[in-house]
Amino acid sequence: MFDNIRDRYTTWLVKRELTSCGKNFRGRNPGYIFLGKGSEVHIGDNVLIERKVRISTGENARIYIGDDTYLGDGTNVLSVKEVNIGRGCAISWHVLFMDTSSHPFAIRGQELRTLIEPIRVEDHVWIGCRAVILKGVTVGEGSVIANNAVVTRDVPPRTLVGGNPARVIKEDVTWE
């Protein structure tokens, strides 16, 4: 009973921070939501965000989480530009989405800069625990990302990838 009351309260707290939120959203005691000035977070219908999930943006960033998507415990969605997670996605625990190199760096003779590119996860994607999805990546519809994979390049639709850096393990996969 206490868990139910706490979940309703934390869902209410999370909804207050969001730009838009669909029907049947549930937030089970997420860690925190920090939105930079001018940023937006849009969450679709029937989304469940588990415990200790962190959503954080820089200024004028966008995060979209599609209908019927699940974000597991300890997942981090960090956006400086845009992170778009499609419909019907299953995101396991402790997954990291990061659309930036985070700190400025320079290769000898070049200007110091931070690399920023949007992340797009298409519909019906399954991402295993402790996977990392880095800047500029598009994960194709129906794909599966293995546990602990570090995704640095686009993943074609219906493809299983794993490893560090992630590589194709199997093509033409399906999952329920």
Q: How would you label these PLM feature ranges?
A:
Residues 101-107, 138:
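Conserved SAM-binding loop
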Residues 135, 153:
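Conserved coupling/switch loop of ABC ATPases
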